[in-house]
From Swiss-Prot:
GO MF term (any one): isoleucine-tRNA ligase activity
Recorded superkingdom: Bacteria
Record-given protein name: Isoleucine--tRNA ligase
SUPFAM superfamilies listed in its UniProt record: Anticodon-binding domain of a subclass of class I aminoacyl-tRNA synthetases, Nucleotidylyl transferase, ValRS/IleRS/LeuRS editing domain
Listed EC numbers: 6.1.1.5
Cofactor: Zn(2+)
Keywords, in A-Z order: Aminoacyl-tRNA synthetase, ATP-binding, Cytoplasm, Ligase, Metal-binding, Nucleotide-binding, Protein biosynthesis, Zinc
Gene symbol of the encoding locus: ileS
Motif 'HIGH' region, residue numbers: 63-73
Amino acid sequence: MCDQGEVSSQNSSDYKEQRPTPRPNLPKIEESVLAFWSSDKTFEASLEQRQHGKRWVFYDGPPFANGLPHFGHLLTGYIKDAIPRYQTMRGQYVPRVFGWDTHGLPAELEAMKRLGITEKSQIESMGIASFNEAARKSVLTYVDQWEEYVNRQARWVDFKNGYKTLDLDYMESVLWAFKTLYKKGVIYEGYKVLPYCWNDQTPLSNHELRMDDEVYKQRLDDSLTVTFPLIGQKAKTCGLDGVAALAWTTTPWTLPSNMALIVSPNVEYVVVSSARQNSNSDFLLCKSSLDSYAECLGYESGQDARASIRRTLLGKEIEGIHYKPLFDYYADLHNAFTILSDNYVDVTEGTGIVHASPAHGEDDKRVCDAFGVPTVVSINDAACFTDVISNYAGMHIFDANAVIRSDLSRDGRILRHESYKHSYPHCWRCRSPLIYKAVTSWFFRITDSVNRMLELNQQINWVPKSVKNGQFAKWLSSAKDWSISRTRYWGTPIPVWKSDNPEYPRIDCYGSLKELEDDFGIKLTDLHRPEIDRLTRPNPDDPTGASTMRRVPDVLDVWFDAASMPFAQLHYPFENIERFEANKSADFIVEYAGQIRGWFYLLHAMSTALFDGVAFKNAICHGIVLGDDGQKASKSLRNYPDVYDVFENEGSDAVRWYLISSSILRGGSLIVSRKKIQDAIRQYITPLWSSWYFFHIYSEAARPGGYKARFSVDSQDILDRYILSKTGLLVEDVTRFMDSFDMASAALQLRDFVAVLTNWYIRRSRDRFWDGSDTGAFDTLYTVLETLCRLGAVFVPMVSEHVYKCLTNSRSVHLSDWPDVATFPNETGLVETMDRVRKICSTGLSLRKRLGIKARQPLSSAHIRVAQVGSLAQYKDIISGELNVKTVSIEEGSCTQRMLKILPRVAGPRLAGDVQTVIAAARRGDWTDHDGHVTAGGIPLLENEYQLVAGAQDSKNSQPLPFGGSVTLDTRIDETLRSEGVARDTVRQIQIARKEKDLNITDRISLEVCVPDEQVKNNLLAFSELICKETLCDRLDILVKKGIDGITVSLEKFRQ
């Protein structure tokens, strides 16, 4: 083991050991441990002792500090702490530097809220300098509270040397990345249709619409089917003069900027006359849409409408036909108001004819650009109509919808109006409904490197594994160029200066402070607006000297900052060159699944473009934390418990275990509730604590001054050999799962092991501990507990620390080495056999429960039938004691028919969606059992996730074994057995009374037992020796009291 330092006043003796109690007070324990870590500087010591180990790189995704953490943050934080702890115990050097995300809309919106302003124009009025100063202050509002939360959840991070994206060094590295990519041709300026937030008056990136399920919300909009009369020579030639094309839209506000209609080239379109009275109109629409429009065209059915088709044409035949525009605003535009064709047209909805507004539709613009149709933007940055649209000038587009509908209806241009409920994108920050708008923006060219990004993706280990070729690969395959500019104020500036005179064009891009200072002659201490905007200089390419180089006003998307984190946190390439280039790819990264399309994606894009390599080697994508109402945990909904209140009542380690051991680490969702957290405590923390408490009490009682146990794997007792070998297998399994970043499976191994430790090893060894002379039992349990503390340090760091320090008197479990499987005996045959014995016993106890026979009631015999007896015979005494039977017989024989019963509540958290697969497989008999390893539908099951039940029992007193065979109990109870059962019930009653009086386990007692009649008295007298031995009774009086109900006991500490 590594050197932990002297056990002196600097460590354990300063630690406030609490008097052991049967149940842990987790908040109090955690308070003690945190205080010790702080004074002892244990985190710093853990780094110092590993500083010569291999550097293991972990990227800690920076949070925004303008709000307090919720359970989603906690989960990510727990994983960010657990994996580095594990790697540190494995000998790696794992620096953990905390960072803060400080730029972008979140900061600006918070500043606007504090300043009491709501519009972008108000920012311009007050001045960018004042606004950005408010933004700077707002982003650090909750830093101290975040540190408090992070420390309280036992996360070990370095705050002192942390970074902020607003730091000058960080921003300089971002400028370097921009210029490098610009020189490579990866960054370019373009004019495209993008998601646009009219409230924040800035474009967004397509990936920002896919990161969060809450971006898309149900919205009710007007759905209009509008008529477009066909005109011109080609319409006459095709016999369509006077026919009106029907186009469907859910955005009436885009109709004033309609420039074209688009059809699908190889789809059939039909001309149908209106069947309405006093109407002689003819309409053109997609043939497949006719059924849905039959009624509004005046037909009783789609069949009637189809029977009235006058003409059928392919879309490509009507391409080039002109139509009468809805409005006259752009009537004179060349190439406008023509039918175009393209395969993107969806004919399953609407009329199969798309109203194209190239200023507000990505595909609309692509098609219109190809045909030379102009793009006109008729709204301003705030989504209000410009003066060109005179009827609606100054009106917000959403307010204009109803007015436009009314005007078109008045003009007879609407065939059908309905309300349409659909999923609609909203801004991920301000939650306003987004629009699509043609804007000039700077782009990160991703489409050219998609294939390389897909190739590099194969080098990444994803958890869950399905992400690699599933969500992430699919997202990469359809990736679009990333809009990286924002028409905002608080962010890293785009480092591009342009000539203000197009007659003398020039563009300069800067990638360092030195380049800026050399050209502008000013020492820079801040790269934010407006300071950076003041940098101007004469255009070197203008011989007249009249034009000036001015910076483009936009700032970078905050996600560009985030994607630069791997190198910008180190101020690369200006510092730490060797350090970064030796570890360009992080060993580990973790965030929630939404970041597959966010930070993970952009890190991958940035690393591919800059370094032609992966940004990270291993990634965990955990699922979404839900509130107690099943919705995503939300501060506004207040649908989850107060985080700090849970810390102060249940404890952080309880929350940590609950989250880390759940299916959320496999990408599923998880509902957080206090009850579930409390239930989780009983899975691992309580059994661990109970085992240590048992060890402490019994080792203290073993001899005067107590027995000082030692780490030993030498015992030859069969139960000791079993639990030591089982511990070695536990180390092997937990290590394997941790190495593959499967923390949930590792946690389940620990949970299952402590159940075996408490319910089997300790219970079956209780007499040896009580005797006190068998030091092998104490050494074995000490060894197991010491190992459990080291394994559990990753999962419950504070409880493990407390138990470890009290157990070993060492400085800290977190300064110890990870257990070595080679330390432990490797008796797999013994383990397999003993596990069979355990299953025999659990089956027998389950049979008792089914038959209504208490475990304390002795029975005469148990008969065990198995396909192969093997070495089971030598375990008869253990089976007899566990099943409370006088004799055990074991024979080889045929097995009863068995059925597999899945336990969904147990299997569900691990298997998630696969649980239904295994249930169905079990029902149809598609399952196998090989040496106790059960597989259903090809999916392996854990021991506690199923039951094997008899399909046809030998008798009601038999129960099938999970590995084949059966247990049969002789349920005949004679008077002697019944008397012993009464005596054992009485012993149990006395033990409860001892606990209630808070007696030490070594305290002797005087006992008075009152019974209702002589028969019961005689029964107890027959087993008085048993009663006295089991309860440490030195004086026993059994009295008959007529009329009492049952047996009562009273006791006192014995005094000679």
